[in-house]
Amino acid sequence: MRRPPRRPAPPRSLTLPGGDFEPAYLALHRSGELRRRAAEALDLLKACRLCPRACGVDRLREAAGVCRTGRLAAVSSFFGHRGEESCLSGRRGSGAFFFSRCNLGCVFCQNCRISRMGEGVPSSAGQMAEMMLRLQEEGCHNINLVTPSHVVPQILEALALAVEGGLRLPLVYNTSAYDSAESLRLLDGVVDIYMPDVKFRDPALAERYLRARDYPEAALRSVAEMHRQVGDLETDRQGLARRGLLVRHLLMPGLLEDTKKILSFLAGLSRDTWINILTQYRPANQVSALTFPEINRPVSREEYYAALDHFKSLGLHRLD
């Protein structure tokens, strides 16, 4: 059995100076720009183009495209999540906000009851604002928007109300990275921490496993824009994330070469990129020995060690 390589040094914190933290969206709120952005975002729902699928349906009239979401966002759950990255969960948890439905079609999705079957409750902007404020009252370190790409207008609506109610937590955009340029433009100056989960670099793999051949092009373009907006991840003196980019990547069986391509892209973006190489893949949803035999197994230790070797060889050093 191969000996595991030495793990990279602990993530190097780009530590923010002392003083009170102010989330980015407060400046937009004071100028009135946050409400204007929310109104502009809602206009995108008339012929929906929130994500690269650009379905063109009128969601304001409850027409449904790929994400099968109409005017209101549906919330599956919201709670203080202690299982996220340590820089997000801290001691009191990350204020996770799980939205129902999704704009992708991952055949291996482990949350298909939420993403495909739509488990959740349609919620108004006012109700979502109350949820955000409750998470703040419970002591959560941030508001963590999980699978948000198809409900950006609804998030902005709710955020504008929550800020008026006293919300002061950093905003985490926890996305599959399948976002449109228009959505990201509206989020510039709103989001503090972008956390894209970059899945595939090869269009053929994206088509087979996500039902989105254009995913790699759209995702890498989105990640580059996210980095332009917020830069490398910065933490406070307690190690809590305050601003910047944190990238997730799910290591999958037999697809090490694709992982290497993604890591190479991220190193080209910045060698200070904070990365979490996820190893919890397991066959789920539509994956079986008959349907997708090539990914019908867990990731091996050898595959993970090889991914770490490549990570180090690129000069990357911030590994969660």
Residues of each region from the PLM?
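Alpha-helix-loop-beta-strand connector modules within alpha/beta enzyme cores
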Residues: 158-170, 221-229, 301-307
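Structural detector of well-ordered beta-strand residues that form the stable sheet scaffold
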Residues: 172-174, 195, 246, 276
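Short glycine-enriched, charge-decorated loop/helix-capping segments at active-site entrances
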Residues: 113-119, 208-213, 290-298
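Conserved Radical SAM active-site core
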Residues: 63, 67-189, 193, 203
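Anionic-ligand binding region
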Residues: 206-238
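Non-cysteine beta-strand/loop elements that form the S-adenosyl-L-methionine
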Residues: 188-203, 274-281
